[in-house]
C-alpha cells in the first residue's frame, strides 16, 4: 500500500511537471507581456459641460477607463463628497511676490475657512511656503486659527523653488488616505529648483495628488511675462487632472479658490484593478477616462506608475533624490 502511494505521487508529480513545462513553453512564445495587477488604481475625475459647469450626478456606467489603451472594469465608484480631503496649500514667498502677499494671505484664509467649514469632518489642510527653500509652516490640521496665524507671518524674499515645492508637497501627501490635492499660488517663475518639472509631476502622480495652480498678477505684456513658468504649471495641473488659472488678478484669486472648492465637492472616484494591460519597459501607464455623453468633458490624471515588463521596476528613489540643501524645513 505504501509503495502504491509513492508510485501515485511519482506519476502525479510527473504530470504536474510536464504541464508546467508546457505552459512555460507557450508563455515563452508570446511576444507581449500581460499581467493582472492586484493593486487598485484610483483615479479622481471632474466632469463639466461644454459651458464649464460641473456635473456631479453621473453613474458608474457613464464612465470608461483605459489603461495603456485597454478598457478596464470600474471596480470602485464613489461621489467625492464622502471622501476625506488632504489639501496642501503652497504659497510662493519669493521676492517677486512680496507686494501681493497680504492679499494672498487674506484670500488663502477665506479658502481655508470655506474648505474646512463644510464637507467631511476628516478634511484637513497644511500650509507650505516656498522661496529658495520650502517651509512647512503648518502641518495638516483643521485648526483655522493656527492656519490664519501662519498666513500672517508670510513675507517675501529670495528666489523661487517651485518644482521642489510641488515635489516635497507630494511626498508629504503620499502616505495619507483619501483625496490629495496640491494648490500652488505663484507668479509662475522657477529660478532655483533642483528638481525638474517632470520630476515634480511624477511625484504628484505617485502620490495620487491633483494639482491646481493659480498664477497671481502675471505681466500682461507677453514680452515680459513668464510664459514658460505658466506652461509648466499647466503641464503639471493637466497631468494630474487639475487646472491652471490664468490670470488671477485682484478678486479673480478668490474666484479661483471658489472654483477649486466647487470642483472638489463634485468629483468622482474611479478605481480599477489593471487586467490584460500590455507592459513595456516604461513604468508609466497611460490613462484615459471618458464619459459616454458627447455634451460633457472629463478631466483626470493622464497616467500612473505601475509594473513594467519583467517586474515592478525601480523605486521612485532610483530616479529622483533629495539633495541635502533642498530638504523640506519645518517652521519652528
Mark where each language-model region is:
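Hydrophobic h-region of N-terminal signal peptides that target proteins for export
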Residues: 19-28
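Scaffold/interface architecture of coatomer-like assemblies
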Residues: 28-332
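Bacterial N-terminal signal peptides that target proteins for export
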Residues: 2-20
Amino acid at each position: 500500500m505504501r509503495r502504491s502511494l509513492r508510485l501515485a505521487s511519482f506519476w502525479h508529480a510527473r504530470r504536474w511537471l510536464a504541464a508546467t513545462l508546457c505552459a512555460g513553453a507557450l508563455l515563452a512564445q508570446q511576444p507581449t507581456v500581460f499581467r493582472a495587477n492586484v493593486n487598485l488604481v484610483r483615479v479622481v475625475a471632474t466632469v463639466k459641460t461644454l459651458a464649464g459647469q460641473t456635473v456631479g450626478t453621473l453613474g458608474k456606467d457613464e464612465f470608461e477607463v483605459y489603461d495603456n489603451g485597454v478598457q478596464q472594469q470600474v471596480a470602485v465608484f464613489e461621489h467625492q463628497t464622502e471622501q476625506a480631503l488632504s489639501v496642501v496649500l503652497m504659497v510662493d514667498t519669493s521676492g517677486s511676490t512680496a507686494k501681493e502677499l497680504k492679499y494672498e494671505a487674506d484670500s488663502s484664509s477665506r479658502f481655508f475657512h470655506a474648505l474646512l467649514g463644510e464637507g467631511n469632518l476628516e478634511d484637513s489642510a497644511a500650509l507650505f511656503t516656498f522661496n529658495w527653500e520650502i517651509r512647512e509652516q503648518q502641518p495638516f490640521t483643521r485648526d483655522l486659527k493656527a492656519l490664519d496665524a501662519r498666513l500672517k507671518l508670510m513675507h517675501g524674499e529670495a528666489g523661487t523653488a517651485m518644482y521642489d515645492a510641488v515635489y516635497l508637497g507630494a511626498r508629504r501627501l503620499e502616505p495619507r488616505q483619501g483625496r490629495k490635492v496640491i494648490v500652488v499660488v505663484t507668479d509662475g517663475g522657477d529660478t532655483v529648483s533642483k528638481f525638474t518639472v517632470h520630476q515634480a509631476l511624477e511625484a504628484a502622480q505617485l502620490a495620487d495628488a491633483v494639482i491646481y495652480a493659480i498664477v497671481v498678477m502675471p505681466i500682461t505684456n507677453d514680452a515680459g511675462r513668464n510664459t514658460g513658468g505658466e506652461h509648466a504649471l499647466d503641464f503639471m495641473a493637466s497631468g494630474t487632472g487639475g487646472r491652471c488659472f490664468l490670470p488671477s488678478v485682484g478678486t479673480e484669486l478668490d474666484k479661483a479658490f471658489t472654483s477649486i472648492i466647487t470642483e472638489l465637492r463634485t468629483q468622482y472616484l474611479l478605481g480599477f484593478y489593471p487586467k490584460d494591460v500590455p507592459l513595456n519597459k516604461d513604468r508609466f501607464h497611460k490613462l484615459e477616462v471618458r464619459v459616454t455623453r458627447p455634451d460633457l468633458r472629463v478631466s483626470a490624471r493622464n497616467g500612473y506608475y505601475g509594473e513594467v515588463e519583467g517586474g515592478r521596476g525601480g523605486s521612485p528613489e532610483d530616479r529622483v533624490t533629495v539633495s541635502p540643501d533642498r530638504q523640506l524645513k519645518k517652521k519652528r
